[in-house]
Amino acid sequence: MRTSSVLCCLGLALAYATARAQGIDLLIRHGRIVDGTGNPSFLGDIAIRDNRIVAMGHLSAAAAKKEIDATRLTVSPGFIDIHNHSDYTLLVDGGAQSMIRQGVTSMILGEGESAGPIGGRQTASSRRVIPGGGDPDWSDFSAYFARLLRQGISTNVASYVGSSQIWTYVRGERAGPPTAAELDQMRLLVRKAMEQGALGVSSSLSGPPGSWIDTATLVAMCQAAARYGGSYSTHMRSEGRGVFESVAEAIDIGRRAGVPVDIIHLKIAEHSMWGQMPELVSSIAHAREQGVQVQANVYPYRAGQNDLATIIPPWAHEGGDQAFIARLKDPTLRPRLESEILNGIPGSSWYDHYTATGGWDGMLLVSLSNPQYKKFEGMHMNEVIAALNKPAIDALFELLEANGGSVPTVYFHHSENDMRYALQQPFISIGSDGTAVATEGPLSSGHPHPRYYGTFPRVLGRYVREDHVLTLEEAIRKMTSANAAKVGILDRGILRPGMMADVTIFDAAHIIDMATYEKPHQYATGVEYVIVNGRVVLDHGHHTGARPGVILKRQDAGGVHR
């Protein structure tokens, strides 16, 4: 006991001497520090010089250029959003308003369809556009990352390379197995992306073009990433009736390719299967016991977001948007389409969002590109069908035909109890599956999922403070160091001298999400300060306009391309 006390005193003395000797730019005083490791919180101060933490402890005699009084506030590592879709909205507003105000300091992008590579056989319909108009003016990750840095970003950014992006570059919008030459080209594109800073390979397999990619091709892509220490992040092929088989596929890919696996937003999105989350988690735990590095993440909501087009069978999407819409207009195909939408495809692993939600009332329309249909934003599909006064399938096809084949949609398809069970598992972390938007300006349109604004405060307010599903320390670990470890970022996610100074300071007694499905454009409350690379981006809840974000790359491969 005496030895421990002496070491503690020596540690505090060393911390103070370090701060005094090096000089301090920013000093956070009197906060309750939750350091990101899962260990108990403690009271203390944090000193920052340039972009790093230089000292922690009781630094009462230290002085700094700027001080933050964190009395009665909680100080944690900046939140790392392991699953984020701000790839293109950052080009409209690098301030990342809705994410910064949640306490997010780093965003992991690139699910399925990443920002690169662009070109090859990709058509206009398979390429994303910058919100508000404008085509990408880059072709690979190097140019995309350079574009972000020229503009300036308030959060740090990292990205996977999307398997769908690779697929459409090589094969366009065609199903079927790739040739040997095409597979070689896919491997080459993955290697190039990894050399330019990609974290690994991601997939989005529940709908085209991702659903066209077979397991063997995914293994080949992941093997190419494995040479660079990459990992595999997957939105699985099915989260409904085929969810157990899809988890098994993800595990199999990790085992065969020799890469760590992170299953995106683990859920059981099928009413008839609610309550089976313990068995699903057990299958993952069993693989972990056998040596497969497989983990998962969740978001704290019982609804997801995808596209209304995903309830149309995959075969109807082949050939791109024009071919897709032509099939919707073909009266000879309507009986088959209607049957498969309402009943699924017997013997198929296709994830049918209609059967998952249990009906039209489980779908809420997010945004519509056609001005004539804007009035339906924020309405449930059954309400839209009634307003259009026509059969449900006719209304569905009309919406898709009139809006370019795409209508972002919120689906209410999984249970609160299943989500809570998953949230409590030590190998399941937290991510938003959201996008940086804002309550004003060009990113304030539409009717987005409330997770865009509220994911992390919702966990801390509802599931920690109110319902005691998690301890504060464990919730913070799931938002910080757990996510940093997944993507090989070694100098963030923990508060410790020498680590990068990404810090979130919040009021644990009042933090809460405000965004709802009915009124989503509302910032969360309770986050007081956000510091990114040593610079204050959120000050007393107000965005300072600072854009100190950088591009993050894997650090756990030692920089060696094996």
Language-model-detected regions and their locations in the chain:
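Histidine-rich, glycine-flanked metal-binding segment
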Residues: 23-24, 33-78, 93
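Metal-associated gating/positioning segment near the N- to mid-region
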Residues: 62-139
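Bacterial N-terminal signal peptides
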Residues: 5-15
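C-terminal cap of metal-dependent C-N hydrolases
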Residues: 31, 421-427, 433, 437, ...
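Sec/Tat signal peptide C-region and signal peptidase I cleavage site
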Residues: 17-21
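Acidic, glycine-enriched loop/beta-strand segments at the rims
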Residues: 33-45, 407-414, 418-419, 467-476, ...
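Active-site neighborhoods of metal-dependent hydrolases
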Residues: 145-148, 153-156, 160-180, 186-207, ...
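Divalent metal-coordination and catalytic microenvironments
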Residues: 31, 46, 51, 72, ...
